[in-house]
UniProtKB/Swiss-Prot annotation:
Documented EC number(s): 2.1.1.223
Residue stretches spanning the membrane: none
Pfam family, one: MTS
Main localisation: cytoplasm
Domain of life assignment: Bacteria
Alphabetical GO biological process terms: methylation; tRNA processing
Name of the protein this chain belongs to: tRNA1(Val) (adenine(37)-N6)-methyltransferase
Record-stated family: Belongs to the methyltransferase superfamily. tRNA (adenine-N(6)-)-methyltransferase family.
Record's subcellular location: Cytoplasm
Organism: Vibrio atlanticus (strain LGP32) (Vibrio splendidus (strain Mel32))
Length: 242
């Protein structure tokens, strides 16, 4: 039987490179946006859920020099690629990898922050390429279970940051609020000025005060045939040509 596994495209950033291997998770604008946007408290203990090739963990390590990051993924191909990327980075001493499910892992301590680019296909046929399907289909990580688990394994002062397409993001926020989370920050992302927002980046908090003082902003990626000044300012520490 022919092996249908597809090698995943690699990508170079200013201070690290991402080897895709057979992870099924090529570098995406979504991941770069989230990694550039998150905010972490000093000396945070961070969990990157569904790390894929390790992109978010590496971005967090670059931006926050005293953060300790655990990165978890259920897929062995993802862990294999992430291992290469982390070992070749300047921050391998601050990132640990775990091949397991976040839903069943017994963590030894609670986290100060969650970062996650979660799956979002709620219906329809899964992609033929199996790793890609697993990475993007909510059958492998239900949003309600994810929100609840994030609440359980974090400290009282913790934050949890995600990026999702707008409809799925709206739904996730409602589910998270049922679990005790409050929406603290939100960034609505448009590809161009003429299109509606296609992505939501959002930060959840356990503090009710944050829910009463929502910080909401918007960002347009492309402007007049190039990248917008706001997008460049957000991502310039990572993209080579910014």
């Amino acid at each position: 039987m022919k092996d249908k596994t597809i090698n995943t495209k690699s990508f170079n950033f200013k201070r690290f490179s991402i080897y895709g291997g057979q992870s099924g998770m090529p570098v995406s604008t979504d991941g770069v946006l989230l990694g550039s946007w998150i905010n972490l408290a000093p000396e945070s203990l961070v969990l990157d859920i569904g790390t894929g090739t390790g992109l978010l963990a590496l971005m967090a390590a670059q931006r926050f020099e005293d953060a300790l990051i655990s990165a978890i993924d259920i897929d062995q191909h993802a862990i294999d690629a992430a291992t290469v990327n982390i070992e070749q980075s300047p921050w391998q001493d601050r990132i640990s990898l775990h091949h397991d499910s976040v839903l069943t892992t017994d963590f030894s301590q609670r986290f100060d922050a969650i970062i996650c680019n979660p799956p979002y296909f709620n219906s329809g046929e899964q992609a033929q390429q199996s790793q890609r399907a697993t990475a993007r289909h909510t059958d492998s990580l239900d949003h309600l279970q994810l929100a609840q688990r994030c609440f359980e394994i974090t400290t009282d002062a913790a934050t949890a940051s995600f990026i999702l397409p707008t409809p799925e993001g709206e739904g996730f926020i409602k589910l998270a609020e049922q679990c005790g989370w409050y929406l603290a920050k939100r960034l609505d992302v448009k590809t161009t000025d003429k299109k509606p927002a296609s992505r939501i980046l959002f930060e959840l908090s356990k503090d009710p005060v944050c829910g009463q003082d929502l910080q909401r902003e918007s960002l347009t990626i492309h402007h007049q045939g190039g990248y917008s000044e706001a997008f460049i300012a957000l991502t310039k520490d990572f993209y080579l040509k910014m």
